[in-house]
Amino acid sequence: AENTISNTFNFQIVTYIDLRQNNSIESIITNIINIISNDNNEARDFAVLASSTKLLRNIDILYRQRTNEQTEITFISNETLERLKQIHQVTDEKAANWKFNRDFEALERTRKQLFTTDKRCLKISTIQSFKGWESPSVIVILENDIVLHNTTFRPMSPQTIYTAITRARENMYIINIGNDTYHNFFY
């Protein structure tokens, strides 16, 4: 279900998309691609923001596969993560060691430092890492708080939502993939 919500931030477009019943990664990507193509802007004018790097990694790789376009990310890519796991022989059965963690953190830090909004491609970032940046159009993905509680990431606090919303200069799109807390607020 798609809904245009009241606009107190003076955005040109504010759209809420409820994917709580169909929150597959394919459905999320299809909606992101449709938003970009229907907006008459280019992918470079968009940033996709969420709380979880795991979700964003999946969005990044599938978006690149479906569109054959590059992305600019604030975290290491799925491919880099898999290579790092191979180098350190990390598997589902064999946990990460301190060398893996050291290299992972160094690569993540470098990605954040190299991130820029000047590149001519879609930007994908955690909400926290996008603080201080802006984009003409922002797509915020509201994740399920229960899923987030089982990770190292904080649930979507009102401050986090505010930070995400205020990153957009012109257009705001919200894709809810399971967050009941904010559904009534945005719908």
Predicted regions and their residues:
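Core RecA-like ATPase module of SF1/SF2 helicases and allied nucleic-acid translocases
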Residues: S37-Y187
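Inter-lobe coupling/hinge region of RecA-like P-loop helicase motors
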Residues: A1-T30, D39-L49, L122
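Well-ordered, non-membrane alpha-helical segments in soluble/globular domains
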Residues: I25-I33, P155-Q159
